[in-house]
Amino acid sequence: MIKVAFIKFGGMANGGTEKYLQTIAAHLPKDEFEVDFFYCDAAPYIGSDFKHLDTDESRVEYTKSHGVNLIKFDVEFKDVTKPTHDWINTNFFDLFDEDNY
């Protein structure tokens, strides 16, 4: 069994890159892949007034119904003043272990 992790800020939003990643995760053959999808709700940006789409419960249900293991993490802010768009006050690194993949 191949373990794969998808990791996306605002990953259960209904649109854009998020929806494509959800679809890929949902349609990987579950007899070959164990799929984890790490996501957070939208959070305010530092350095921009842009508002990311928030979690859409229909997308949560869609991915769950296709055998995807959802793992929700917290982010207080996304700092877009830095080239790496740092996640501020996140517990992501407490939940994700790269050695599992």
Residue ranges and their predicted role:
Residues 1-5:
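Extreme N-terminal starter segment of soluble prokaryotic enzymes
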Residues 29, 91-92:
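Short, solvent-exposed coil/turn linker segments
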Residues 8-14, 27-85:
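N-terminal strand-loop element at the rim of the active site
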Residues 93-101:
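Short N-terminal targeting/anchoring amphipathic segment
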Residues 18-23:
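A conserved mid-protein helix/loop that constitutes part of the nucleotide-sugar donor-binding site
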